[in-house]
């Protein structure tokens, strides 16, 4: 429930009210708004939590200079910097295991899930030693935590990734995918990092209808808004597989264009 409270999307929260309080939301890349929110509530603020690449919002990477300033602001004011890498972590964004490493900051706490066990239910939280010492046994637990199967899936995933040179591969294929998406008729903007990409569609093209059309044609797509497609392919995706989607995407868009 605290995780739901942290999101800035009311639609995700409505079915689970009442939620824990204590979260303030400010616009991404707006340092002045962050300053104001913190200084107006300084006695009650303990941390700043960010996604290096916002996923549900439409795949928006942070501006590196602004994020660096956020990290410095946290250090100056004694605030913990928490980075949510649930979507963007585990080599999803290319060169490094975590997206924040592409952006020149060092967080105090990292949350991760999804890719850590190749989609098997698994989550983890990492922290600097000084921060982790605040945890006592039982403070952060789960009824189903520590599943042997989940641990085995995560171990196999991390061993495979550490041996597979996915850092260079994801960056290379991600650049290829970005370039190809930008050439598709009906796409107005492509953004993201590595193999975490978002593509905005022209006005009048419903992204959710494109997703439905894609499913009929054998493509599993995702929409994060009325006109934004999100692409999170497997890290082993090939240029040939990307080409198949790129060849089919104009037809999907044309089929639903109003």
List each model region and its residues.
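Conserved N-terminal phosphate-binding loop of PLP-dependent enzymes in the Aspartate aminotransferase
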Residues: 1-258
């Amino acid at each position: 429930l605290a995780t739901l409270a942290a999101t800035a999307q009311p639609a995700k929260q409505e079915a689970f009210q009442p939620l824990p309080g204590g979260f303030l939301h400010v616009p991404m890349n707006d340092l002045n708004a962050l300053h104001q929110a913190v200084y107006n509530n300084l006695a009650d603020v303990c941390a700043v939590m960010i996604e290096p690449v916002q996923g549900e919002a439409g795949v928006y990477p942070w501006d590196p200079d602004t994020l660096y300033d956020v990290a410095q602001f946290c250090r100056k004011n004694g605030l913990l910097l928490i980075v949510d890498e649930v979507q963007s972590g585990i080599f999803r964004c290319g060169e490094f295991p975590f997206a924040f490493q592409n952006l020149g900051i060092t967080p105090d706490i990292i949350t991760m899930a999804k890719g850590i066990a190749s989609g098997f239910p698994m989550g983890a939280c990492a922290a600097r030693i000084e921060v982790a010492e605040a945890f006592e046994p039982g403070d952060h637990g789960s009824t189903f935590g520590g599943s042997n199967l989940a641990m085995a899936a995560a171990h196999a995933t991390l061993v495979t990734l550490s041996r597979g040179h996915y850092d260079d591969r994801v960056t290379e294929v991600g650049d290829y995918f970005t370039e190809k998406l930008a050439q598709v008729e009906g796409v107005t903007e492509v953004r993201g990092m590595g193999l975490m990409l978002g593509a905005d569609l022209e006005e009048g093209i419903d992204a959710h209808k494109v997703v439905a059309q894609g499913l009929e044609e054998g493509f599993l797509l995702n929409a994060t808004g009325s006109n934004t497609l999100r692409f999170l392919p497997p890290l082993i995706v090939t240029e040939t597989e990307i080409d198949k989607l790129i060849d089919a995407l104009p037809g999907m868009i044309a089929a639903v264009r109003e």
